[in-house]
Amino acid sequence: MSLEIFVADIKEIPLHGKCIDVVTSSHALEPNGRNLVLLLKDLFRITKRKLILFEPSYELNSKEGKDRMDSLGYIKNIEAEVEKLGGKVTDIIPICEVSNPLNPTACYVIEPPTVKSVTLDSPVYCVPGTDFKIENNGSFLLSKDTGLLFPILDGIPILRTNSAILAMAKFKKS
């Protein structure tokens, strides 16, 4: 098994659409209540078969726990939001052993919406949140489509939009 790490923003995943068979998350969506729909859309974009979310369950929580989640801006209504976006929650499994009873975790097993698009056998880096492929020139990852360069520091690609460098001159034809 090989592992490639990169730095990215969860709102703009720098992978080509439909290139990951099973995507998982463990409390990564939790503090992003205002961005749940945006995050689900991008997760659906890259997921081929299943999205498995281990996230707090507002619906399974107590009144005190719901108040806490509301005050912290945590996500809620995962099932409803998934279905609005065309996905399907096939199972919700409450996790019995939780460290904080005011933050009960559930495992949401989700099928992403069916869309006609190119699927890839393996992950390919792209301009964050898009399917514009980027190429590795050793020092940078570069997009001929957008003119953006992304730095590589100590072998780790930094694939955040706010870290990109606009370098159109690098792509001009003589």
Write out the residue ranges for each language-model feature.
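Conserved SAM-binding strand-loop segment of SAM-dependent methyltransferases
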Residues: S2-E12
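Short cysteine-rich clusters marking metal-coordination/redox-active sites
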Residues: Y125-T130, L142-K144
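A conserved beta-strand element that flanks and buttresses the S-adenosyl-L-methionine
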Residues: T24-S25
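A short, conserved alpha-helix within the catalytic core of class I
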Residues: P31-D42, I46-T47
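Core SAM-dependent methyltransferase catalytic element
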Residues: I93-Y125
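Conserved beta-strand signature within the Rossmann-like core of class I S-adenosyl-L-methionine
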Residues: T47-L60
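Short alpha-helix
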Residues: R68-C96, A106
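Hydrophobic adenine-recognition pocket in adenosine-nucleotide-binding enzymes
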Residues: A28-L29, P56
